[in-house]
Amino acid sequence: MNLHQTVEREAAAAFAAAGIADSPVVLQPTKNAEHGDFQINGVMGAAKKAKQNPRELAQKVAEALADNAVIESAEVAGPGFINLRLRPEFLAQNIQTALNDARFGIAKTDKPQTVVIDYSSPNLAKEMHVGHLRSSIIGDSISRVLAFMGNTVVRQNHVGDWGTQFGMLVAYLVEQQKDNAAFELADLEQFYRAAKVRFDEDPAFADTAREYVVKLQGGDETVLALWKQFVDISLSHAQAVYDTLGLKLRPEDVAGESKYNDDLQPVVDDLVQKGLAVEDDGAKVVFLDEFKNKEGEPAAFIVQKQGGGFLYASTDLACLRYRVGTLHADRLLYVVDHRQALHFEQLFTTSRKAGYLPENVGAAFVGFGTMMGKDGKPFKTRSGDTVKLVDLLTEAVERAAALVKEKNPELGADEAAKIGKTVGIGAVKYADLSKNRTSNYVFDWDAMLSFEGNTAPYLQYAYTRVQSVFRKAGEWDATAPTVLSEPLEKQLAAELLKFEDVLQSVADTAYPHYLAAYLYQIATLFSRFYEACPILKAESASRNSRLQLAKLTGDTLKQGLDLLGIDVLDVM
């Protein structure tokens, strides 16, 4: 159930009864549970508009909420706030519904969309590094939530598998007579670095590299065979990383830059024909009045370089047109580094003008900040190199396994390693997903692997704590009437029933940290409930009810963490 909507509906009816039906309720959870479950903040605005005394008007609204099936009490506070407390019977009934439904009583959206979400998208011919982590796990979590809420999710891994870097690699391998050799990804990285030096320092080599790019684009069989070898090696590495991270991305989700190669010139020609793109110094440019350059003139969105070459803008336009026209997207999400914000704003504006992005199709740039080291600079190795993602994940698992072994010396090495993988990978992912994605955040091993505070290990341990209760519980009646008599029982019940509200918020805004914050709230609230309300030693009715709350807490934690892409353990 959507608890917020349910309470808001009751409050809106009370507003109508008080003669202010046209005013927004402005409902939000109370900051202090002692004041109730929700607070109405819309009365003061309505009073100002109606030229009435806000406290008197608030009292009318509160009186209209008397004898309500959902709301137990409505108390006026301050200049016109109304604190609402939910009826225990209403909470108990909905706890039963959530407990006995695989979807927790959460309805799928009545307006399902086809959502195309672009995430991860590394450049190929090199190993994935920490810079690829955020897009990969943020995009994966958003896609999981959207699918859970009933949408059709089309994942797109827009890998960088085309362009100058491949011409450089081919030129270098031919020059070194290694074009027929077998090689691995580490070799490709070494070759690429050497080729880049040659490209920057030797004009003749640079010309040769560009010639190979032309051959690649023209379908030369020899060059294409080498290119495919580069791509296959790189994608195999990427998929291994995705599998380690537990991502939903699969090989069939790959739709790289090369996919749109044949569409680039037609898109540019179409923009010219529509009068959007014009020639400027030999390049094809769309001038956008909505954006200004340093001189205050319309900004230039270059779609074709002087000499006929293409850019990211060309590929992204063709890609967007494909996603709307062929994949039938109702909504487009691009999970990309925040530094690309202007590019995507200009892409969307150009696409709207060209008719590639109709008004009934949504498009959003889902930007994210930078992973920082403790020194406040982008996260690097001690030698200043980019941290390879495989190395980071390996270290996470090793550190977590050591911590688990330290806490449980009796564990065998294999069991500690197994638990360590779940805890370590979960810790890395949660440390990221629990932060507002638009912010930079500091990567800190000690903080993320702590069993205290807002961390994956804390939430995973909270889940195992629930499981330990049921290992000792013996028989109990999951269908017995739920009785909520203690304040913490009611508070936990009300919080558990906000699951749908939170998931809908994540689906609407693409901010996974809302879900992380909710799960942490559930875990901390359960800890307080566990300490204050004996479960197994309580008398029969309370025992069953508290076991029901514990069961729903565990199920909610497990489902919520799964939507973040994080596994749980029955024992830690």
UniProtKB/Swiss-Prot annotation:
UniProt keyword annotation of Cytoplasm present: yes
Motif extent ('HIGH' region): 122-132
A GO CC term attached to the entry: cytoplasm
Transmembrane regions: none
Coiled coil: none
Subcellular location: Cytoplasm
GO biological process: arginyl-tRNA aminoacylation
Molecular function GO terms recorded: arginine-tRNA ligase activity; ATP binding
Class of the enzyme per the UniProt entry, highest EC level: ligase
Keywords: Aminoacyl-tRNA synthetase, ATP-binding, Cytoplasm, Ligase, Nucleotide-binding, Protein biosynthesis
Cysteine pairs bridged by disulfides in the record: none
The enzyme's E.C. designation: 6.1.1.19
SUPFAM superfamilies linked to this entry: Anticodon-binding domain of a subclass of class I aminoacyl-tRNA synthetases, Arginyl-tRNA synthetase (ArgRS), N-terminal 'additional' domain, Nucleotidylyl transferase
Predominant location: cytoplasm
Keyword Nucleotide-binding listed: yes
Chemical reaction(s) catalysed: tRNA(Arg) + L-arginine + ATP = L-arginyl-tRNA(Arg) + AMP + diphosphate
Domain of life: Bacteria
Family matches, as Pfam families: Arg_tRNA_synt_N (PF03485), DALR_1 (PF05746), tRNA-synt_1d (PF00750)
PANTHER family noted in UniProt: ARGININE--TRNA LIGASE, CYTOPLASMIC, ARGINYL-TRNA SYNTHETASE
Family, as annotated: Belongs to the class-I aminoacyl-tRNA synthetase family.
Subunit relationships: Monomer.
Protein name per Swiss-Prot or TrEMBL: Arginine--tRNA ligase
Lineage: Bacteria, Pseudomonadati, Pseudomonadota, Betaproteobacteria, Neisseriales
